[in-house]
Amino acid sequence: EITTRLVGSEMCIRDSNKDRKLLSLYFCAGCPTLEGTGDVIKAMERKGIDMIEVGIPFSDPLADGPVIQSAGTVALKNGMTVKKLFAQLKEIKDEVQLPLVLMGYLNPIMHYGIEAFFKSCVESGVSGTIIPDLPFDDYLKVVKPIADKYDIRVIMMITPETSEERIRFIDEHTDGFIYMVSSASITGAQSSFGDAKLAYFNHINSMNLRNPRMIGFGISNKQTLTSAQDNAAGAIIGSKFVTLLNETGDPDKALDGLFECLEK
């Protein structure tokens, strides 16, 4: 069985039974409401989500599509900050068993302080981080030693444009999982994956990497979900869930709506 478990703050995904696939969801902290972070996370845990990506809003998010950009804008207007987010996560730390992964750009993390950021991750029950604009050399020289000190996983992204040499290097120097982006373009829902993407998934699988993979960006229905889960340890859904959360204003309703979409 694939289990996502926390040992201290270690996140391990074990992929031994191909029938059990992970589903991870992303939402932007502070959207639609400033104080709703804990409610969204607890609803996800109740509904059986395996892992949660909590977005740190930033004013210039390069990889984000319009849905997540606009969620970030709302969150910033609502007053969400890195400090506020850590305080919210700390409040629910004892109630939440799921692995939490913070996804945010380098600028707000550096502004908070890299060491302070990873220390706060431990204190608030965060297992891993995804920093889309973190150059790999800076990860190795600056970020990895600090993350390792606090036993926090730094998850790296790969795209169809990432060279095989770089993918092997990432596989060797990171733990947790590799985030396979199904497209080099910005995030957003898609109705299906074309042949080129499926060939890319097959190619990555043929590399026999030591880290499990999760596929994200563009998953919004049964076809894209199945395709992602057939080709990796699981799927990550962002834009579709964020849209539903904004429309309903209620995490339980948004999750029910998402599960409905994933059946179609």
Predicted regions, residues:
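Glycine-rich phosphate-binding active-site loops on the catalytic face of alpha/beta enzymes
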Residues: 51-61, 126-138, 178-189, 231-250
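Catalytic beta/alpha-barrel core
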Residues: 77-80, 125-139, 153-162, 181
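Catalytic cores of alpha/beta
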Residues: 34-44, 162-173, 219-235
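Hydrophobic faces of well-ordered beta-strands that scaffold small-molecule active sites
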Residues: 23-27, 52-54, 100-104, 129-131, ...
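Active-site beta->alpha loop and helix N-cap motifs at the rims of alpha/beta catalytic domains
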Residues: 56-58, 69-134
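C-terminal helical cap(s) of enzyme catalytic domains, especially alpha/beta-barrels
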Residues: 64-72, 143, 240-264
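Glycine/Thr-rich beta-alpha phosphate-binding loop at enzyme active sites
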Residues: 68-71, 78, 167-206, 246-249
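Single conserved hydrophobic/aromatic residue that forms the stacking wall/gate
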Residues: 1-8, 12-13
